Amino acid sequence: MKSAKGIENLAFVPSSPDILRRLSASPSQIEVSALSSDPQRENSQPQELQKPQEPQKSPEPSLPSAPPNVSEEKLRSLSLSEFEEGSYGWRNFHPQCLQRCNTPGGFLLHYCLLAVTQGIVVNGLVNISISTVEKRYEMKSSLTGLISSSYDISFCLLSLFVSFFGERGHKPRWLAFAAFMIGLGALVFSLPQFFSGEYKLGSLFEDTCVTTRNSTSCTSSTSSLSNYLYVFILGQLLLGAGGTPLYTLGTAFLDDSVPTHKSSLYIGTGYAMSILGPAIGYVLGGQLLTIYIDVAMGESTDVTEDDPRWLGAWWIGFLLSWIFAWSLIIPFSCFPKHLPGTAEIQAGKTSQAHQSNSNADVKFGKSIKDFPAALKNLMKNAVFMCLVLSTSSEALITTGFATFLPKFIENQFGLTSSFAATLGGAVLIPGAALGQILGGFLVSKFRMTCKNTMKFALFTSGVALTLSFVFMYAKCENEPFAGVSESYNGTGELGNLIAPCNANCNCSRSYYYPVCGDGVQYFSPCFAGCSNPVAHRKPKVYYNCSCIERKTEITSTAETFGFEAKAGKCETHCAKLPIFLCIFFIVIIFTFMAGTPITVSILRCVNHRQRSLALGIQFMVLRLLGTIPGPIIFGFTIDSTCILWDINDCGIKGACWIYDNIKMAHMLVAISVTCKVITMFFNGFAIFLYKPPPSATDVSFHKENAVVTNVLAEQDLNKIVKEG
């Protein structure tokens, strides 16, 4: 009788908790457990039945050498020694009232609080403060882009080492370290506000048509304020060092502490909270930007939010995050190395690791010498690498849209930047959180196997791919823009903002303040030829505009003036916004529904002792191929659709003011479809390559035959014990 089909799996090695469970069982139970969980034992047992006089050497000497009647105290001490389960507290302080926290739910609560804090700072406050920091410290956009990338660079450099060494360490204390670093990074990021001095206002910008204007000096000199760039980068590097253990060791600790069918629900909840953080960060940051940057001078200055010189108090949110993050250090450090019941939970788990020819030594990974071999082992796991590449492709598109969706909404549907950002956040954040929770819930509800979770992720990606073509439907024609798509009623030229009607106004392209008159949008009141504003009216209204032909009366003033222009963009005639938001919301849900299943699949398809390292590799590759290049690729793509650049009086090109809406929609569809196809390809290839461990049918077959072979098996086991 040959070994059963599918049993031979070198990667499928039982963990030490399973050994403890079998030591306390009766001989018959030992036989059934061995047949159902120990591949090498299963391969050797049929041969022993054929030749009982030749005892087989067991690959696990500790199993046969231990007597079957091990005491409960012995088992308990072995369990505590292996998993170091303990009570919640610090040193000798372990009050009973705090033991309610010493559960998976208690740890999940603290994990979620730290994930929310990290999301508030890194993906909320930093993103919303970048433009203010750029103006305050006189930096180029390329430099502020480097600030944004510093977090991912730090994460990439540290993720492998933290995940490898942290796997053998005290994971909750690693998360206490993460809370410390996140708080420190937030504090460092806010320091330039306290050392750069008081913000000095420049002169008011004249936005109307004047025949004489002071010339602008183009002598460039490097400002000392730009040196604070290095402080911001240091803050981001510290934040990256804090985020590394949070999303590698924290996820692995959650997976350790709960049964397999609940793991996806816990992980999905934790990831959903990390998405909730940016939502809070955007709301908090937006409110703080309505406060003047120098709080003490806020009431004494005449400048308002409508003034281009206005800068908000971007730094307050970082101080609040610093305090909150450091308040989590002590709670995390009070958790034991393993929560109570971890040994029992691990004993009941069945490995679903992908079968390969790699070494699966139980002691593998305990020494630093094993790091290169462990890294090589994971890189040779084709299923794992396919899943990592699929998440990287998905990360590229999600980070790109997270950065530029407000810009797309603003330009396609003619909205203000603040309202577009609000709508973008209202679609992205709830959709992503709902998708994460729903994906984790479905995997947990139906107790999907590793292969089924990959199939589920493939299905959700397919739905998201189909709905991604919403950008083709949502495209809107550009509204008439004088000098860009409209030629000043035939008196000017396309591509030139200057026309005979404003030639004597000495207008500057350094200040973009759009106005609308006669259904046409103008770059500024000056380019519309407006010489006078109407005071104390919201929105601001201009009259005596030489470039606007149709006369419009202003009834709110004592006199009647003609040739009116109103501040702001012209109202768009495109009514596709509600449909676009609804469909894109569904796209986001299905996109993020695959996140938790893929993470669970990665945890299941690798060796138990390499899960943290696997997550570290995933996050490193995800950032190298996804989150770092994603915004850059999206930025270059959107810039390629620009039809009106900001060129100041010194001839230096800045940001883009007007985009070709049709071309932008087509380009975003091309990126979305390409990334989704890559994601589905690697998901499908992972499903094709995956070789599961013994199926339930194989295990049931052995359990049914265990009764027949029980007597011979007990004799064989006793013989090995005597010889040992």
Curated annotation (Swiss-Prot):
It is found in: Basolateral cell membrane. Residues 1-105, 167-172, 255-274, 337-377, 444-447, 604-612, 691-724 are cytoplasmic. Disulfide bonds join 501-530, 507-526, 516-547. It is a multi-pass membrane protein. Residues 495-549 form the Kazal-like domain. The keyword Transmembrane applies. Optimum pH is 6.5 with estrone 3-sulfate and L-thyroxine (T4) as substrates. Keywords: Cell membrane, Developmental protein, Differentiation, Disulfide bond, Ion transport, Membrane, Phosphoprotein, Spermatogenesis, Transmembrane, Transmembrane helix, Transport. One of its GO terms (molecular function) is organic anion transmembrane transporter activity. The modification Phosphoserine is found at residues 15-16, 24, 26, 28. SLCO4C1-mediated digoxin uptake is inhibited by digoxin itself and related compounds such as ouabain, digitoxin and digoxigenin. This is Solute carrier organic anion transporter family member 4C1. The lineage of its organism: Eukaryota, Metazoa, Chordata, Craniata, Vertebrata.
